[in-house]
Amino acid sequence: MSAEQEKKTQGTTKEEQKSSFASEDVASKQTEEAKAVFGDGVAKQENKSGASTNDEKKPAEGDEDAEPASPEVHFEPIVKLSAVETKTNEEEETVEFKMRAKLFRFDKAASEWKERGTGDARLLKHKETGKTRLVMRRDKTLKVCANHLLMPEMKLTPNVGSDRSWVWTVAADVSEGEPTAETFAIRFANSENANLFKENFEKYQEENAKILKKN
């Protein structure tokens, strides 16, 4: 290579270096201007790789699961309800007799006996009038399945083929609200209980007959 060509080559190299340094100065100047206007975050986004830097803020562990503590809230009722006393219409009566039994009702339409309920058959005597009625409630639900006065015309008759059950007819049973004529059959655990029921039934039936006769 001649001396003249070497000079040309060296001149070209110096020009390229100047151009490169000038480009770097321009880029640096633009970065500084961006920092001044938008802050350091914008300048970082102008990195050639475009990747996020390690200086980016990371969420603290457990922040997503953390819940702000709330104080316990207590609400007072706007309207205070007073206790309501439930009445059974038996408050003015005394229990003269009680025996567990199962009650049946004769369904005329189907011409068959249907179970009415299981519970305590009770003879309740009113404190003022002195009249006695038969009241029986179903277990658990306490729904009334028999409710009528022991009238003089009623007659207990043995159920066919059983020594522990009785059958009788009622002109006005009010267990369903409205008075209805019913035929009942009541069955006890044994004949002794059945006979005790019959004795007390007829005893208070006679007392009712005397009271009704006076009236």
Curated annotation (Swiss-Prot):
CDD domains in the record: RanBD_RanBP1
GO cellular component, one term: nuclear pore
One of the GO BP terms on file: protein import into nucleus
Disulfides per UniProt: none
Subcellular localization(s) per the UniProt record: Cytoplasm
Region described as Disordered: spans on this chain: 1-78
Superkingdom as given in the UniProt entry: Eukaryota
Assigned keywords, A-Z: Cytoplasm, GTPase activation, Phosphoprotein
Alphabetized InterPro entries for the sequence: PH-like_dom_sf (IPR011993), Ran_bind_dom (IPR000156), RanBP1-like (IPR045255), RanBP1_RanBD (IPR045256)
Xref: Pfam families: Ran_BP1 (PF00638)
Stretches with biased composition (Basic and acidic residues): 1-18, 26-35
Residue list for modification Phosphoserine: 70
GO MF entries: GTP binding; GTPase activator activity
Domain RanBD1: 74-210
Function: Stimulates the GTPase activity in the presence of RNA1. May potentiate the action of RanGAP1 (RNA1), thus playing the role of a negative regulator.
Family listed: Belongs to the RANBP1 family.
Protein name: Ran-specific GTPase-activating protein 1
